Amino acid sequence: MNNILKRAYDALPAPLQSMILGGYSALLNRERYGGRFQEYCALMEKRQWLSRDDLISCQDEEVRRLVSHSYETVPYYRKLFDDRGLKPADIRGCGDLVKLPVLTREDIKKNFKALVSSAVASRSLRGGHTSGTTGSPLEVLYDPAAVTMTYAALDRQYKWAGCRLGRDGDRVVVARGNVIVPLAQARPPFWRTNRSLNQLLLSSFHMSSRNLAEYFRAIGDFAPAVLDGYPSTLYILAKYLRNQGIRFPLKAVISSSETLYDFQRSTIEESFQCKVFDYFALAERVVFATECDRHEGHHLCMEYGVTEILDENDDPLPDGRSGKLVGTSLANFGMPLIRYQTNDHTALRSGPCSCGRGLVMMDDVTTKAEDILTLKDGRVISPSVLTHPFKPLTSIEESQIVQEELDRIIVKIVPGHTFSEGDRKHLVKELRERLGDEVRIDIEIVESCPRLPSGKFKWVVSKVPLGV
């Protein structure tokens, strides 16, 4: 939304803002849930029960189609193949993708126009940007089919959670990063409605101990079945309920876009009396992974893309070994991304989920490159292991770890009323046990922890280059 439209929107009363949001959503829904949406949903419903080998065979066929299309219509890939003496016939399936180099963010920025297919009308392409959580935002383009398949994958996640998306589906409260309420607004309502999808949209930028009671009055009046949002925002809502001694039963909670830590999951499930279903997706639309009702990990949406795990030399790693997450989109033929190197690390599993689906299982993605601490002695510390000192401290409203130097971290604390000197000493002691005596640990009391412009929250922020 440009500045003029934003100012005009901000000047409108809340009911008119809701009407505009609903109308805009209805326009987007034609593409998201129109076209081949039902076809993709039926395909995903059928294929999820195939064996792993059969699913890979289906992917092999899609890879051949993608490679042929890319060679014939995308200048970047035509040159890449020719320079390497390759023909499309040399890539017979997923296993042959290793004959091609990984595609980096820098490659996309330098060759943006050359990566666009001449076979897809430019007016039909949609633009998107990564959030910039691991660097500067990256612009990518995708065709309508990629948009539709993304929402078919999301629809399957909702179905696995026992819920239904859409105007005639379950009522959903959404707590994400869109600035739907003017930031200068000091009084409720800090929410808007989207009737086209049966949603109540919450502002993530106005939540405070002073305002949360008003939020929950609105949520209660809306009577939702589902809560969908960023883990950090869901956790704020859940902690408020816990501190008030209240339970707010829902059918399911859907989380995505940030790492969901175990302490967040347990608090959210306790407060909302239901299971959390977490999914992983990227703006580049190369990977989509969802959680079923067994909660044994994330199922890769193998209809959506091919996923590889590589070591630091770009060599494939076996199942069970953690490495760089690399994805090839099987949905986006407008700007094909083949072997795109994400900034994420994870591992694939060799065994199936007990649910019986053949979709390959992926471990949680918890270690984005900038969020790993690198210490002076060369150790790298995953943020997940740093959550434990905070678990018993219900006196902390919010926290954030910032690494300024190899031997110094700052722990930002938004304290509750009962936060004490003993709690501070506990944190320093427990963190020092995990980081070592050579690391200086400073506790900084703050009113709020900063978020990214997208509204997302990074719990661990490292300003030190990754040491691996």
Language model region names:
Residues 227, 331-437:
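AMP-binding/adenylate-forming catalytic core of the ANL superfamily
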Residues 65, 177-303:
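Conserved adenylate-forming
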Residues 260-352, 369-371:
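Conserved AMP-binding/adenylate-forming
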Residues 70, 130, 172, 227, ...:
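Residue-level signal for inorganic ion chemistry
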Residues 161-185:
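Carboxylate/His-rich catalytic cores and anion/metal-binding grooves
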Residues 1-129, 136-169, 221-228, 242, ...:
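Nucleotide 5′-phosphate-binding alpha/beta core
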Residues 199, 276, 307, 399, ...:
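Generic structural signal for residues in well-ordered beta-strands
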